[in-house]
Amino acid sequence: MTTTYDDPRRWWALAALGLAVLTLGFDITIMNVALPTIATELEVGTNGLQWMVNAYVLVIAGLMLTCGALGDRYGRKRLLLIGLGLFGISSAAAAWAGSAALVIAARGVMGLGAAIMMPVAFAVLAALFGPAERGKAVSFLVMGLGIGIPLGPIIGGYLLQHFWWGSIFLINVPIAIIGAIAIAALLPESRDPSPRRPDVLGAVLSTAGLTSLVYGVIEAPGRGWSDQVTIGAISAGLVVLTAFVAWELRVRDPMIDLHLFARPQFLWASIAGVLVTFGMLGLLFVVPQYLQFVAGHDALGTGIRLLPLIGGLIVGAPAGERLAARAGYRVPVSAGLAVLAAGVAIGALTDLQSSYGFVAAWLATAGLGIGMALAPAMDAVLDALPTEQAGSGTAITMTLRQTGGALGVALLGSLLAEGYASRVNTAGLPPEAAVAARESIAGALAAAAPRRDPQQPQRLTTEQSTDLDEGSMKVSSTTLWWYPMGV
């Protein structure tokens, strides 16, 4: 393996990697603030919006471990350049897509590029930095990823305020070009001299199982939970995931070393990380829609009003670390989950008369819980692993968290969609408006908007508009209740 411990260019290479990782982070959530605009522009329902979010995260979760192994075998610099190329090209395709199907497909390819870059970016640090500096370099990349996730809605809001919705994807293109040039010039090639064989079948089984399972969850509100397609998709997903577990237990070089879960600390810390990511990404799917559709804020205003969540996270992270040093990992992780659940439960009390101060308070509370739990949970995972398994154990945890985020969006979004059919009052609306109102929040708010065309005989009344707004608010708050109940 080529090393460049004394090469001053290594810090510039780290900066390029940090920029790429920051982009991967905010691309996980940048879609959320744009969902209302995309729903209107492309006439997309809730199911389609969920797949625009999940296509990216789910591909990352399914392919991250395999892509990391490919980097070890074929060269990490080469894989990084391939990942950046896929990410940049698919971002441009998504920006100019004219249909929901094309956006979803492009997001899937973006996820493939991210799945290549995320593990390889961390693995390549071994060729750049010696043991004394490596911890600082790893922290830099982790910080970039952590800041990028909550930063996504703010960047997205600013872009939507000044440009069209495709700009949230187009911003990735120059970053990918700059990153590719910097990596090609500054990064040495490195590979594992004795790499493990890639677990292709394991990757296929895990991706197919998760995709089928989440597809069933997303489709259930529209088709019904007893529908054959819903039952078939969920059942197939569970069967394939069971086969995945059986395969991983017998294959020589498994994608996931399931024996790690026999370590209690690794198990509970991994579950805690999944719960936190589930709640964070699920929250970032539901709340922007409330802020735009119900509270009436524009895209940038929505992003800015999510800042209390980031503020709580920034305060909670060091507090959790200090508490872990004094009382062990379980205390801050358990306390963080409790604070997060409490914040979301308070958020479920939000109604049409709630002030933004109330919303900001419970968002900050939820962010505080996320910050308190997330870093100590990762520290607990690393502490439970022997040194020789630190890399694979970290990759497992990252994959599980990405999967938890995808399921958070799917399950909370599924509950959100299901509520419209039963709780939004469309009595007295014209047939087309009633169908649109039951399909999604975008349709409900479009139907609720007073029609100013004097030639239109079926003008909505103030009472009808209020009923639809209240229906949207009720189903949003009911959806938020499910997270603290689950925790």
Regions found by a protein language model. Name each.
Residues 1-185, 319-320, 327, 348:
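Transmembrane-helix bundle of Major Facilitator Superfamily
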Residues 98, 130, 186-189, 221-222, ...:
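Short helix-capping/hinge motifs at transmembrane helix termini and TM-loop junctions
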Residues 178, 380, 396, 401-487:
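Hydrophobic transmembrane architecture of multi-pass small-molecule transporters
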